[in-house]
């Protein structure tokens, strides 16, 4: 059974995912619609079965990383952004390393959220 804090956490996660769609520059309009549907689906699954949330989230992360790595325009845009960061005095990163680190960190965040949900008895 869900606790009130569980409902707040799950709702905040879903709203955060939907908010990120607005600022996602690497996706086409069709992909943004897909991400909205996926976010809503995740929100529903959070209420019904958290293990499905973990599987769906990790699958989405893997597919997103794969789509960036296989899209020449996405890689070029990411390369351009990384060059801007480096020109501003930031650390130099390659496209593949950036995607791998981002996917890894996001996956750890999902697993951490699931751990919190299990610990608090939400999941």
PLM segments and residue spans:
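Hydrophobic, membrane-inserted alpha-helices
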Residues: 35-47
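Lipid-exposed faces of alpha-helical membrane segments in multi-pass integral membrane proteins
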Residues: 8-15, 37-40, 59-62
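Short hydrophobic membrane-inserting alpha-helices and related fusion/pore-forming segments
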Residues: 1-7, 48-57, 108
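Short, amphipathic, aromatic/basic-enriched membrane-interface segments that mark the entry/exit
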Residues: 19-37
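Juxtamembrane boundary at the C-terminal end of a transmembrane helix
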Residues: 110-123
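N-terminal signal-anchor/start-transfer transmembrane helix
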Residues: 4-25
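Short alpha-helical packing/oligomerization segments
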Residues: 44-77
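Interfacial loop-to-transmembrane junctions
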Residues: 81-107
């Amino acid at each position: 059974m869900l606790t009130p804090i569980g409902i707040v956490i799950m709702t905040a996660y879903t709203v955060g995912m939907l908010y990120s769609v607005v600022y996602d520059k690497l996706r086409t309009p069709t992909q943004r619609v897909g991400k909205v549907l996926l976010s809503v689906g995740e929100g529903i699954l959070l209420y019904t079965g958290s293990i499905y949330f973990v599987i769906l989230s990790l699958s989405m992360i893997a597919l997103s990383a794969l789509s960036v790595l296989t899209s020449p325009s996405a890689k070029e845009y990411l390369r351009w952004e990384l060059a801007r960061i480096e020109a501003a005095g930031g650390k130099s990163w390659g496209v593949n390393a950036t995607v791998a680190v981002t996917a890894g960190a996001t996956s750890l965040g999902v697993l951490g959220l699931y751990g919190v949900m299990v610990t608090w008895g939400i999941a």
